Amino acid sequence: MLCLPVFIILLLLASPAASNPLETRIQSDLIRAALEDADMKNEKNILSSIMGSLGTIGNVVGNVCCSITKSCCASEE
């Protein structure tokens, strides 16, 4: 008598139509948010490193130009 209701409950829990538990939804939301944050941080780090490299390259080019000719150097007073 008790086996049939238990069997039905187990079938409902194991069926693919059963909704995800709340904890699983929260975990998937947190994982998705963490991945989005990681992507944004990587983009910011890449852009800042590129801009930093461009500044360094510009200084090197300016120093080389100043050593060759004084026309590209800033006037020193």
UniProtKB/Swiss-Prot annotation:
| Keyword set includes Cell cycle | no
Q: What is its main location?
A: secreted
Q: Name one GO cellular component term.
A: extracellular region
Signal peptide from the UniProt entry: 1-19
Please verify whether the record's keywords include Nucleotide-binding: no
Return the InterPro entries for the record.
Conotoxin
Q: How is it modified after translation?
A: Contains 2 disulfide bonds that can be either 'C1-C3, C2-C4' or 'C1-C4, C2-C3', since these disulfide connectivities have been observed for conotoxins with cysteine framework V (for examples, see AC P0DQQ7 and AC P81755).
* Tissue expression pattern: Expressed by the venom duct.
Record-level Gene Ontology MF annotations = ion channel inhibitor activity; toxin activity
- Per the record, the domain of life is Eukaryota
Its annotated compartments are: Secreted
Q: Which UniProt keywords apply?
A: Disulfide bond, Neurotoxin, Secreted, Signal, Toxin
Record propeptide residues:
20-44
* Family assignment from sequence similarity: Belongs to the conotoxin T superfamily.
Q: What is known of its domains?
A: The cysteine framework is V (CC-CC).
Q: What is this protein called?
A: Conotoxin Ar5.1 a
